Amino acid sequence: MPSYELALVLRQLPRPELISVIRRTAESILDKGGIIRKLENLGSRALPHKVSEHGVVHREGTHFTIAFDTAPTKIADLKEEFGRDIDIIRRYIFKVEEPEQKPCTLHEEMLPPAYRKDVQEIIAAAQKKQKKKFNYNSGLDYYPFQK
């Protein structure tokens, strides 16, 4: 199952109601067969601009991120369900890309440039690429336009 991150902006709520909204959100992820990896509260902040959602204008919100794994077919259902929730102002689901694993090449990079494999490849490519000389192909063994 791929990893996803849900960024939520909730309306200003008292703590008990805030907990019930987060619980409701987490249960909907679990009901769809997801696995919650991390829940992070980013705190209450003023929104960058006023946001109108479900007929109410919001200027402040509580921000949360939830890292979870679920099947890609369930993402549309989650977006639709979160869109109907009146306590959620904004919701964004991002697919988390796994970081590319690069092998350690420190022992090769510590070699002098003449011994490095990538430098040798560059030198070999430069030697292969030589400027082509124009061939006249006139059939004559002399150049007739010479003075």
UniProtKB/Swiss-Prot annotation:
Swiss-Prot/TrEMBL GO biological process terms: mitochondrial translation
Cross-referenced Pfam families: Ribosomal_S6 (PF01250)
UniProt-listed CDD domains: bS6_mito
Predominant cellular place of this UniProt entry's protein: mitochondrion
InterPro entries per UniProt: Ribosomal_bS6, Ribosomal_bS6_sf, Transl_elong_EF1B/ribsomal_bS6
Coiled-coil features, chain-numbered ranges: none
The protein's assembly and partners: Component of the mitochondrial ribosome small subunit (28S) which comprises a 12S rRNA and about 30 distinct proteins.
Family membership: Belongs to the bacterial ribosomal protein bS6 family.
Protein name: Small ribosomal subunit protein bS6m
Species this chain originates from: Drosophila melanogaster (Fruit fly)
Designated gene of the protein: mRpS6
